Amino acid sequence: MNKLEELTCALEVNKAVYDAVRKNLKVGVSEQDIYELTKTVVDKMLPDVSHEFIGDFVGGKRCSLIGGDATDYKLKKGDGFILDLSVRCGNTWSDTCRTFFLGEPSAEIKKAYDTVLKLQSFGATLVKPEICAEKVKIDAENMLKDMGYGGMMPHHMGHLIGAKPYMTPAFDIGHTDKIKTGVFFTLEPGLYKPDSWGLRVENDYVLQPDGAKLLFDYPTEIEYFIV
């Protein structure tokens, strides 16, 4: 397989994991349970291909920490759950994120989630060949400030992927390299309220001469992730 085929392969695994989580996530399930479910799906999907995975498995108030390893924390009604998953198929890594909700989210969270989706769409219009990487973060932060969410995205706006699950330049302050045609990259806007909630949505793209092409065709609307 070439690199694009390997990434496509990995992204099919990401989809299968999210499908499995939607079916199995419920009150009383632990972060560790979801980690084990993820491992089962990844191994089943790639029995004859060199593979591995890493990810963030955080629920409840732990979502405000942005990420972290799975613990024995058991999910409660009203919790969010962030599953940020990187899968290696052959020599190429994917990196996507979805946020699930155990029950109807509050109006505050719904508004924040909608803002994240708008920011992701905005980011996809920004990434063009030869753009300075940090400009994507700067413009994203300006948009968040205008919408009343200034300072609530304390991480980069995305990064390159490929031979590693995280590669530079990232779309972050201080990353002044220009983005080249043909690279694989992510956009992962997120919003976080300390000791309360957090949410993030991440998709993978390839940069073509005319701009970003989405490679991860999986739902993002919040209703799809309410379980």
Task: Give the location of each predicted region.
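Active-site neighborhoods and metal-handling regions in enzymes and metal-associated proteins
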Residues: 1-227
